[in-house]
């Protein structure tokens, strides 16, 4: 614990805890403070002026990161026939119907994204208690219930990031790796923030995007001036 505390203190050196940094400067700091022996994920957190306990203040959506996420995404697809063939051709890791249902019911969930054709949603619905808590339940609002399984698989593999506001009004997501060029990280962050801004619910009142911070997996958080991230 003492060693970890020393590492964290060292990482925070040079950071002004109350300062709001421009996004370009914030990313430079995040990259310079990343000291783990693996390629850390760069993460964004956004505090929103919503109360997700109210249905008209729920924020949910998907963002296609222009430069990808840098992570390997394992994709499962519930489909039959030609659509199953499309999913396999697009690079889905596991494709099936009743057979895939049995695998998931057996507790074997070796995928990060789940896609389904509309006709198989009654089947997939049986897995609500398994997939729901893991954020894996297919949903038409984020493009994972679709007949275009080829496009959905390509998007998931290419860096599509789903987001959903948590109870405290916070959204967070991985938007790249510390090995990415600074400009690519900035572009990804701006794209993600723009997607969240466009997902503003009708019931949101007051300032919608209140605070933004970026960090790496093992690094300190860096507060960001929202106006340097938001395009509008």
From Swiss-Prot:
GO terms for biological process: regulation of translation; translation. SUPFAM superfamilies: Ribosomal protein L1. Keywords: Repressor, Ribonucleoprotein, Ribosomal protein, RNA-binding, rRNA-binding, Translation regulation, tRNA-binding. Pfam families: Ribosomal_L1. It comes from the Bacteria. Belongs to the universal ribosomal protein uL1 family. Binds directly to 23S rRNA. The L1 stalk is quite mobile in the ribosome, and is involved in E site tRNA release. Protein L1 is also a translational repressor protein, it controls the translation of the L11 operon by binding to its mRNA. This is Large ribosomal subunit protein uL1. It comes from Methylorubrum populi (strain ATCC BAA-705 / NCIMB 13946 / BJ001) (Methylobacterium populi). The gene is rplA.
């Amino acid at each position: 614990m003492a060693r970890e505390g020393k590492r964290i203190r060292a990482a925070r050196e040079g950071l002004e805890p109350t300062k709001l940094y421009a996004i370009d400067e914030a990313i430079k700091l995040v990259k310079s403070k990343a000291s783990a022996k693996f390629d850390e994920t760069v993460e964004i957190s956004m505090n929103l002026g919503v109360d997700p306990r109210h249905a008209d203040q729920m924020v949910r959506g998907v963002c296609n990161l222009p430069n990808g996420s840098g992570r390997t995404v394992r994709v499962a697809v519930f489909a039959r026939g030609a659509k199953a063939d499309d999913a396999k051709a697009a690079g889905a890791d596991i494709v099936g119907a009743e057979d895939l249902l049995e695998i998931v019911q057996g507790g074997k969930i070796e995928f990060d994204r789940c896609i389904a054709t509309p006709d198989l949603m009654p089947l997939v619905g049986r897995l609500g208690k398994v997939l729901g808590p893991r954020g894996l339940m297919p949903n038409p609002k984020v493009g994972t219930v679709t007949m275009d399984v080829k496009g959905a698989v390509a998007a998931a593999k290419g860096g599509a990031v789903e987001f959903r506001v948590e109870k405290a009004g916070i959204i967070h997501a991985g938007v790249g790796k510390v090995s990415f060029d600074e400009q690519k990280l900035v572009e990804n962050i701006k794209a993600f923030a723009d997607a969240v801004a466009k997902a503003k619910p009708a019931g949101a009142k007051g300032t919608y995007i209140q605070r933004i911070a970026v960090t790496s997996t093992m690094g300190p958080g860096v507060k960001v001036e929202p106006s340097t991230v938001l395009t509008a």
